[in-house]
Structure formats: C-alpha cells, structure tokens
Amino acid sequence: MELQGKTVFVTGSTRGIGLEIAKAFAKEGANIVLNGRREISEELIASIEAFGVKCVGVSGDISDFKNAGAMIKETEEKLGAINVLVNNAGITNDKLLLRMTEEDFDQVLKINLTGTFNMTQQVLKKMLKQREGVIINLSSVSGLMGNAGQANYAASKAGVVGFTKSVAREVAPRGITCNAIAPGFIQTDMTDVLSDKVKEQVTQSIPLQRFGSVEDVARAAIFLAKSPYITGQVLNVDGGLVMHG
C-alpha cells in the first residue's frame, strides 16, 4: 500500500514504540491518529503535523468494545476511513506465577489481547467494504519463547500471534493483510529501569549483542504496510534472539 494521504490509527501512541511508529508513517505522508487513555496533548499533535500531514488525537480505552467502536467512528468523522491499524497498546504486570492474582492476569490480557480484538473487529467493518486495508499487531518475543515472571504478558502476546494468523486467513480474500511484529529487547523507558547487570546479561543472549531501538520496530511496521503479498506472518525485531528453523 502506498501510504501518502492514507489514514493510520496507532493505539498507545503517545510515547515509546507507538509514537515512533506514528512518526514513521507521518514521514511517509500518512495522516495519523494518535491514541492513548488520556487526552492527547496539542504539543504531541503538533509534532506529527510538523511532517506536513494531518493528525488528530483520539483518547479512550481499547479494552472496552463500545469505546473502541466510538474511537473508530470519531476517526472516520475527522479523517475518513482508516487504511492502516497498528495495535500497539499494551501493558505489563510482571510477577512470578504463584504471586500473580487473577486480576493481575486478566488485566494484562484485557488490554493486550482483548483490546487488539476490539480494535480489529471495529475497524474491519469498513475495511471489508473497502476491500483494502492493513492490520499490524504488536506481539513480543515473550509470546514466542516465554519468560519467567511474565506468564500473563507472554500468554497475551502468544494470543496475539494466533489471533493475527486467524484474522489473516479470514480477510485475505478481501485484499486485507494482517501481520504481527515481535520486538525483542528494545531501548525504551520500560528497559531503562533494568540494572546494568541485567542489561549486560540480556545483551550477552542477543546475537547482535545490543538492544534494539524504537526506530527498528517502526521500520518493520512501514515494511509490512507496504508489502501487499505478506500476510499472516510474525516479523521478529530482536537482534536474532529468536531464530526459527
């Protein structure tokens, strides 16, 4: 898909990976919908408009199905039909399994997996009529290989992989692609809190011997959006941490 003038909705895009993905699409000439649970600041909107594109902020809770629908409707009223949906929003709540409450588990799945379902189903209603569209879901290497203390997060991200492949099969006849990106250890405020010792241990496990950048993930999103013959795939952006035979 050529991105000039298209409308791209990126959930959880007020900072980190989501914001960088939004900027990358703006650089390609796409109009951007910034999203978060709180009201989007005018300064943030202006930073995207500086690329010469339109940008609106749409706040709301993706884990609420009706709220997800309302956000899609608001976007369509302001910018027209959505051409690309990037399901980036996600949370963590790391604890060892025996210390994890039912609420700890459910909360992470509700945002990471149910939220992805909510936004995808709501946006597909019009995409199917358009017979064109791109859906990109953010998974994680944790969903591919597991990680101690992340049973809830890994389960949610593994669910995103299965969801992505199933949706891809359903919508392919209408010319819509659905893929996932599985980032590894990416330098963000979430990894900044790790101790130097932990960072060194992690780095030693990565073949490329370094953390990735938010730009690495954003480039993967642009690649998938521009690749109409790739669907149902999981693109690892992890420095070689997970290698499939």
Residue ranges and their predicted role:
Residues 140:
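Residue(s) in the substrate-gating loop at a strand-loop-helix junction
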Residues 124, 132, 210-237, 242:
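C-terminal substrate-recognition "lid" of short-chain dehydrogenase/reductases
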Residues 125, 169-173:
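Alpha-helical segment proximal to the catalytic Tyr-Lys
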Residues 28-43:
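Conserved glycine-rich Rossmann-like NAD(P)H-binding loop of the short-chain dehydrogenase/reductase
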Residues 120, 156, 164:
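Active-site helix of classical SDR
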Residues 96-97, 104-109, 202:
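Substrate-binding pocket helix/loop in short-chain dehydrogenase/reductase
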